[in-house]
Amino acid sequence: YGDTYEAFVVMDADNLVAPNYLSVINQAFDAGYLVCTSYRNSKNFDSSWISSAYATWFMREAKFLNNARMMMGTSCAISGSGWMVSARIVKGMHGWDFHTLTEDIQFSTFCCAHNIQIGYAPAEFFDEQPLTFKASWIQRLRWTKGFYQVFFSYGTDLLKGIVKGQFA
């Protein structure tokens, strides 16, 4: 792969995308971003207070973190699905080599450690969120384990980058 396509979009099988999703995220690609995240909205906002809390968190993440970082010229962060990566990056790595429980965080950290700036595009997609506290708790335990996998793999590289003043 990579010889036919300019970029890949990573989605979960049950994600839904807005009709203009690809054209909006492609604008960021055309602007030079080799990696770009987008706006995750909830498919089931009104199903429970848990799913509503997730949707509110994702709005905050998109508007006040990633959009603000984009406006300031600093790197954004990938979170879950709904993001694009240039085929040049995948080809340059000789394939996809991110297999932790939180490969999104792992790839974001890799980008930061290698001075690859992640952009943000307001391309909207919809993701189903947990409905119960128990389901949310189990998901967050998995995320925590994945975070530590990434930390122990990239912590030294990130500290070296901070010392050198490199911030993607």
Predicted regions and their residues:
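Short beta-strand-to-loop acidic/aromatic patch adjacent to the donor-nucleotide binding site
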Residues: 4-16
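Catalytic donor-sugar/metal-binding loop of nucleotide-sugar-dependent glycosyltransferases
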Residues: 73, 108-126
